Amino acid sequence: MNILKKFMESGNKPELITIPSGQFNLLRSKNSPKAALECIYNNATLSVRKIGKFDYELAVYRVEDDSEGGTGDEAENFEDDTISVLSTQSKKKEEEWSVEISDKIMFHKTWDKQGNVALVWENLRGDEQDEKVQFVVAADVSFSDVEQFIQTVYRCQFEVRNKKSSLTASADDLKEIEHRSTRLFVQDDDDELDSSSDDFQDAKDTSFEHEKESEILERTPSPLKKVPEGEYCCLVMSSLYMYDPIQEKFILQEPVVKVAIIDTGKYEFWLAIEGKDNRLGTQVAPNINPTFELATDAFLFNYTLQNITLSYMLKFKDLDKCIQFRFAWVKCLWMTLNKETWTDVPEKEKDYILDSSSVPLEKQFDDILHIDDRSNEERDKESSESENDSEDEDDENDHSKRIISSEAFEEPRRATSKGNSSLTVAFRNNRSYVTRDNRIGVFKTDDEDDSLEFVAAIKNISNLGGKSIDPHKPMLYMEDRNLILTDGENENKLYKMDIERGKVIEEWSTGDKNVVQYGPTKKFDQMTPEQTIVGVSQKGVFKIDPRINGKNKIAVDESKDYVGKYNFSSIGTTESGYIAIGSEKGDIKLYDRLGIRAKTAIPSLGQAIKFITTSADGKWLLATCESTLLLMDLKIKDGKNAGNIGFLKSFPASENVKTYVLKIRPEHSASILTYTKKPIRFTKAYFNTGIGQQEQTIVTSTGPYAISWSLKGILNQDGSNNYPYRIRRYNADVVADNFEFGSDKKVIVALKDDVSLSKVKSFKQPSKGVLMPSASLQDFYG
């Protein structure tokens, strides 16, 4: 639900942000002879309005509701009470209530006795002392929207107090406002966190007294005070850290906090963190980038407020506590994503889900025991390699020579162009093809000087009937002389385009099968005269053969449909023609050929599989999800099928597919999210590819960042800061990137309006200089 109403007018007062639904109540002190709680507006909205350069007000609007329309004496009494609360209001007092925002109102968040989120502040216009007002937020308003509203109020308080823009406010400035409001309120609030609680009584000196801190962390905590109503799935103690992007390290915020995961119903769960000075809450969801580091007994996650994303770390007392929390987290996250109960999941699938939730789990356990075993020589070598990568100034200076504007194939230039939309790299020659509206630009690489050159443009692409089409999902075909395309509209039609002629020469129908994705029958078929291709619909997998007589080109005897919609979403093939199919649910099926049952079914980890690519030999599978990559080792290690791959034989009951979940670490993604204001969304990830070459590097992108992973780095993570990925930031969003065929040294990158050739060694270790321009660091600290 979008609650922002920037620049929308309410009379002459612009509303900055609005909570669209809730109940407005008057809260009297316990000493009042009147009722402690009285409903003012049964249905209302709450807004922040700008009334001056650095002046703001909270405004509550009454929304007409049948339940409020009383008659007779009862209505008279209710109206009189309303007037006492609104005693200084204008004639609109029965429909609207407002108060200027200042430190005096002590605005803060709490929960009512029913577990609903409530916003409370001082009633400065009341007839009695210690009166407060309360806005109980409707259940259909998201927690993130509420947090956004609260942070807006605190920023307004900052501007009112300091008479300057809140863009200059540091995180500490806003936290001070929040803490002051909360501290002054808790003195009169019996439900507030008790600062004398046994859980926190020794916490004052724990910053330097690790023994006392350890004793506190061992305790079984009492339930949290201000959290949504629901069943506790987990309740533990930890220390709380926050990542400082300036110092590039985690800073202790509080030595002892309570941590709970709460089942709020309908497969939704809430992570609550509560200490003496800190209180955080967020939904259990993948978009907070949850990451476990078992080698350090830690859990990392992102927390977004306003347009700033912070990275927090919970550090548990020991591995047992971390594993206890991890088990609850993985289980609740899986239920949130799949809308199914954990008890319904088969035991083998449970093991796979739990084993795959850390990257790599087995390796991290090994690190715990052997983290200092590596030789100094090996560490020095890695350090040297890292320095060489980060000091590649020649490549930086050369980079401008290797950027080609895509506008070169727009004549005349079109102001309405949507920009580049895809990149396809040839295998047989040094060409690359970039789609842009109804054009395709042809580029070539020159190995002698590592340059990229614009060759030609295929313009005004149209179908056989002469209707202009914008090409989608291009795939090179038949010795790289043709492209297979869709038009983005007809899901059961494919087009074959002759590249040399620059024209569509054939149209293929797939009958009643809507093609979701398609690819070569074998990984390197585009280098051969092979004419068949494979594809998936939402409920089936099939082969397309253009030699079949008639319009429908589906090879029925080499196709398989499933009963009901499986929501297949992606397909990939190996050099031998083994097939992997992913679904929107997140599961993957492996086949040795079409038309039969899958040899291996890999359970879902929760996120949809957008794209699949495989290593040539079928040992590795790489799946692209929204914010993660799944790297799967398909080689069977145990049992009678040991040595085989999952395409040919099923995994034994005692063994699961080894899966590495690749993601951007929370402290890095926090900088990315704050800089781009967009969530992480990976483009299709690729292995480096070549005949007889070993896959050893992965490349993908999100926003303006191209990202590469080293397979060796993934398999040899040691818990240090030598991250297995490197990043390069561009001045525009990356549409797609892929390796030059036969090399893992150079990456072709399609930007919105440009095409670039970059060396992999120009990608850097993630740091504040790489992730954000220096000017944008003020987003965090003013």
Swiss-Prot record:
Region span, Disordered: 188-215, 372-422
Secreted as UniProt keyword: no
Modified residues (Phosphothreonine): T486
GO cellular component entries: cytoplasm; nucleus
Subcellular location: Cytoplasm
Pfam families xref list: VID27, VID27_N, VID27_PH
Acidic residues bias locations: 188-200, 385-397
Keyword tags: Cytoplasm, Phosphoprotein, Ubl conjugation pathway
Compositional bias ranges of the Basic and acidic residues kind: 201-215, 372-384
Modified sites of kind Phosphoserine: S170, S195, S196, S222
SUPFAM superfamilies: YVTN repeat-like/Quinoprotein amine dehydrogenase (SSF50969)
Family membership noted in the UniProt record: Belongs to the VID27 family.
Additional record remark: Present with 3500 molecules/cell in log phase SD medium.
Function according to Swiss-Prot or TrEMBL: Has a role in the negative regulation of gluconeogenesis. Required for vacuolar catabolite degradation of fructose-1,6-bisphosphatase (FBPase).
Protein name stated in the entry: Vacuolar import and degradation protein 27
Gene name of the record: VID27
